[in-house]
From Swiss-Prot:
HAMAP family noted in UniProt: FabZ
Listed name of the protein: 3-hydroxyacyl-[acyl-carrier-protein] dehydratase FabZ
Record-annotated membrane-spanning stretches: none
Cited function: Involved in unsaturated fatty acids biosynthesis. Catalyzes the dehydration of short chain beta-hydroxyacyl-ACPs and long chain saturated and unsaturated beta-hydroxyacyl-ACPs.
Length: 145
C-alpha cells in the first residue's frame, strides 16, 4: 500500500506544523511502513535550531518515526483515529548518528517487532541517502475511544 499526503491527512490526527510525513511509499498494515519526510529550509524549527547551522531536532525525527508507526497501525481497515487513539508509552534505545539538514530526504522505516493485545513495539530507522541518521524503539498502546 502507498499513501499520498491527502491520505495521510485523513489517517492521522496531526496537522501543520506537526504533520511530519509527506508520503508513505510502502505499508503492510500492522507489520511495517516506509515513509518520506522532505526536509526543507522553510521548516519552522530551523529558525532557532540552529540559525547559522540548521539541523532537524532529534525529537522531531523521533516524532516522524512515531507518525509512521501510526500509519502502520491506522492503515488496518479496522482502525482509524476517529475510533481509536494511540498513546506512545516509551521511546527506547534512541540513537542519533547523522545530522539531518535542509535538502535531505528522510526515509523512515518502521517494523512491528512485538504485538500483544493492545500494545505494539516498533523498531524504527531514519535514513538519509541510505545512511543511518537515527534509530529507536517505540512502544505504543492502541485504545478504542
Amino acid at each position: 500500500m502507498q499513501f499520498n499526503i491527502q491520505d495521510i491527512i485523513k489517517m492521522l490526527p496531526h496537522s501543520y506544523p506537526f504533520l511530519l510525513l509527506d508520503k508513505v511509499t510502502a505499508c503492510v498494515p500492522n507489520e511495517s511502513a516506509t515513509a518520506i519526510k522532505n526536509v526543507t529550509f522553510n521548516e519552522p524549527f530551523f529558525i532557532g535550531h540552529f540559525p547559522n547551522n540548521p539541523v532537524m531536532p532529534g525529537v522531531l525525527i523521533v516524532e516522524a518515526m512515531a507518525q509512521a508507526c501510526l500509519v502502520c497501525v491506522m492503515s488496518d481497515s479496522k482502525h482509524n483515529f476517529e475510533n481509536y487513539t494511540i498513546y506512545f508509552m516509551s521511546i527506547e534505545l534512541a540513537k542519533f548518528r547523522k545530522p539531518v539538514i535542509p535538502g535531505d530526504i528522510l526515509t523512515i522505516e518502521v517494523n512491528v517487532i512485538h504485538k500483544r493485545k493492545d500494545t505494539c513495539r516498533f523498531q524504527c530507522f531514519a535514513r538519509v541517502d541510505q545512511a543511518l541518521a537515527s534509530e529507536a524503539q517505540i512502544l505504543a498502546m492502541i485504545k478504542k475511544n
